[in-house]
């Protein structure tokens, strides 16, 4: 029994080397597992409209998490919560979770969330806000579970579908599109009415004429 337990733990904590695409626009799977959700959703951690890909891990999958994109960590948010079955929709909002938001070199924001599950009771995160991470770099671990949600920009093209199996860093789950630039605010051009030379000179000429026509007694007064 001891050896069986030892083999199970050794397999669970394994972290095999993987081949990864060199496509800079590729978003790689952060974990081994099965896609259970592909939909548009408002990311609760950035407030942006996004495309969501959820990947569920069973106890036999590799549970090391890898960064799906390269960039700088903008924020990390940890939430205490319940330990519901991670395949349930409400697990995204109610379970213990850790959300990391990364901004890519071209300014695109990608958020990925470690979610604990029914068996998993421990989320580990090895990175800090401000760290610059490479794509496919190990950043965390969920012991004995569970699920990772990836929130992508709306311009991204999702390449996986519900029910599809993923292999961490080997499976490309999406490709980032071109970054959407905010509209440039143009200052309104203000046209100043200058008028003709004659119109500009008229007030000055009128003032001179008034001074000449003034009577001596008026000046004396």
Predicted regions and their residues:
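Contiguous, well-folded functional domains in the mature portion of proteins
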Residues: 1-198, 203-204, 217-221
């Amino acid at each position: 029994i001891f050896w069986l337990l030892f083999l199970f733990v050794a397999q669970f904590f394994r972290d095999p080397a993987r081949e990864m695409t060199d496509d800079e626009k590729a978003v790689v799977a952060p974990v081994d597992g099965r896609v259970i959700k592909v939909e548009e959703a408002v990311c609760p951690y950035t407030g942006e409209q996004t495309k969501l890909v959820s990947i569920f891990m069973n106890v036999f999958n590799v549970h090391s998490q890898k960064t799906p994109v390269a960039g700088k960590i903008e924020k990390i948010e940890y939430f205490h919560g319940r330990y519901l079955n991670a395949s349930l929709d409400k697990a995204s909002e109610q379970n213990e979770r850790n959300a990391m938001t990364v901004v890519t070199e071209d300014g695109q924001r990608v958020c990925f969330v470690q979610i604990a599950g029914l068996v998993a009771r421990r989320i580990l995160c090895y990175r800090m806000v401000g760290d610059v991470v490479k794509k496919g770099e190990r950043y965390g671990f969920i012991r004995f579970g569970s699920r990772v949600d990836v929130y992508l920009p709306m311009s991204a093209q999702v390449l996986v579908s519900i029910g599809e199996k993923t292999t961490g860093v080997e499976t490309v789950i999406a490709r980032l599109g071109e970054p959407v630039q905010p509209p440039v605010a143009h200052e309104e051009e203000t046209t100043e009415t200058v008028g003709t030379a004659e119109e500009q000179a008229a007030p000055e000429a009128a003032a001179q004429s008034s001074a000449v026509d003034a009577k001596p007694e008026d000046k004396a007064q």
